[in-house]
Amino acid sequence: MSKLVLVLNCGSSSLKFAIVDAVSGEEHLTGLAECLHLPEARIKWKLDGKHEAQLGDGAAHEEALAFMVESIIASKPEFAANLAAIGHRVVHGGEKFTQSVLIDETVVKGIEDCSALAPLHNPAHIIGIKAAQKAFPALKNVAVFDTAFHQTMPEEAYLYALPYNLYTDHAIRRYGMHGTSHLFITRVTAELLEKPVDELNIINCHLGNGASVCAIKNGKSVDTSMGLTPLEGLVMGTRCGDIDPAIIFHLHDTLGYSVEKINNMLTKESGLQGLTQVTSDCRFVEDNYGKKEEATRAMDVFCHRLAKYVAGYTATLEGRLDAITFTGGIGENSAPIREMVLNRLAILGVEVDVEANLKARFGKEGVITTANSRVPAMVVSTNEELVIAEDTARLAAI
């Protein structure tokens, strides 16, 4: 147990954590705190069986981290004794960070400086980093950036049609997120299809409270739906994704919204939350589709947007699409959403295997299209934690 890495993945409304052997890939502990900031905030973990505890109404990342360290890890003294390093998923590195780095005060400051580009995530990452440094002061911490995988995007994909000096002077461009997940899915899909990674063309749909699509050509990211920030692209839990930019001016000039109110609305009150005006939880939308108007409306918009992105990204792959892959909490578990999206892609020759699709959830992976489908669609469980553990072990020299 000499190369154990504690991996922390602080999302906008969740905290995934794991203790991973960076050599064997074995996970000794896995857990998820979810629905943070909501009344039903809870934490689940697997360690000598499955466990669950309520964190309290509105509990945030700090409470989840404290519970993890004081109640879960503390129950196994050998874990703390054998932890060699701590790896952190960081959503946005801007142009400051193009690869994983050892964390010091300068890196923390750099991550904080990028918070304007990921306002729901980077502040949560800082909380995780500082809590980890306090709990385990002798261990090295490593930051693994979601933006790194997308550094291979060509200029035509990452530039916005704005005055060019905004890029050269202020680095305003598309960066993309979920890169660690997109990288892992690329590797696994290549193995499943028995193709070399550098010959693989896929479109990967990472669907969770945050969601993005990535066009992967010859194993490298060539386009992705998130942009300068995680706000662009798909409909998400609380984020709007693509909108007409002029809506912002209309809200400000005509309706009198402040800039702060608009920013808060687009990042925290839109997406599924805004469309339902009930919740950001996709499970409510799925369970009530066809029963409640707000759920039906939200799911239709979500699937319409996603299918458009997948279809559009076929244009970046120069005539060959080896697979469409689904991952993330929604991608891995929502058979209805996958079916609705794939049915909208019939023009690509996609044909859903309804039975296989229904079975592919709760950790079960596999092909969810028929043998007649021109393009296979697959459910593949992501493992960002393993990628983070491997990078952490390398940089911490453990």
UniProtKB/Swiss-Prot annotation:
It is found in: Cytoplasm. Its EC number is 2.7.2.1. It is an enzyme of class 2 (transferase). InterPro entries: Ac/propionate_kinase (IPR004372), Aliphatic_acid_kin_short-chain (IPR000890), Aliphatic_acid_kinase_CS (IPR023865), ATPase_NBD (IPR043129). Substrate binds at residue 89. Its cofactor is Mg(2+); Mn(2+). ATP binds at residues 16, 206-210, 281-283, 329-333. Mg(2+). Can also accept Mn(2+). GO terms for cellular component: cytosol. The record marks 178, 239 as: Transition state stabilizer. It comes from the Bacteria. GO terms for biological process: acetate metabolic process; acetyl-CoA biosynthetic process. Mg(2+) binds at residues 9, 384. Pathway: Metabolic intermediate biosynthesis; acetyl-CoA biosynthesis; acetyl-CoA from acetate: step 1/2. The active site is at 146 (proton donor/acceptor). Keywords: ATP-binding, Cytoplasm, Kinase, Magnesium, Metal-binding, Nucleotide-binding, Transferase. One of its GO terms (molecular function) is acetate kinase activity. The keyword Magnesium applies. It catalyses: acetate + ATP = acetyl phosphate + ADP. Belongs to the acetokinase family. Homodimer. Catalyzes the formation of acetyl phosphate from acetate and ATP. Can also catalyze the reverse reaction. This is Acetate kinase 1. It comes from Photobacterium profundum (strain SS9). The lineage of its organism: Bacteria, Pseudomonadati, Pseudomonadota, Gammaproteobacteria, Vibrionales. The gene is ackA1.
